[in-house]
Amino acid sequence: MLRAPIVSIVDDDDSVRAAMSSLVRSLGYEACVFASAEAFLESPHLHDTSCLIADIQMPGMNGLDLQSALRARQERIPIIFITAFPEERIRQRAEAAGAVGFFSKPVDGRVIIDCLDTVLRPG
């Protein structure tokens, strides 16, 4: 049997991690949660991650820095950004670097579902 794709969730807010994890699992994907970008980068799940949902504003390494670190490591993981501070210049920077989504918190679960379906569903 094929293993479900892994969606990693990086957010410093416990409630966001719990909500996103529940949503991801309801779609049949495996969810791995991390409270920081640094924890994700050190995780054994890094190379198995099929899609990443990440906050922009976090203590320590922020979401854009995480995106840059992944690119520097040649990791081509599709990233969906969620943020409580949706600045246009940040969105443009994230998308220019390859983000597949950029959404404001509180995020509508349907937009995350649509984005995950686009990235992870075959055909």
Which residues are covered by each model-predicted region?
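Alpha4 helix (beta4-alpha4-beta5 surface) of REC/receiver domains from two-component response regulators
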Residues: D65, P86-G101
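C-terminal output helix
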Residues: R89, V107-D117
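Acidic catalytic/metal-coordinating carboxylates
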Residues: A35-S36, N62-D65
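Active-site residues of response regulator receiver
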Residues: L52-D55, T83
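Receiver (REC) domain active-site loop signature in two-component systems and cognate sites
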Residues: M58
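Two-component/phosphorelay signaling modules centered on CheY-like receiver
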Residues: D14-C32
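A short, hydrophobic beta-strand element within the central beta-sheet of small alpha/beta folds
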Residues: R76-P86
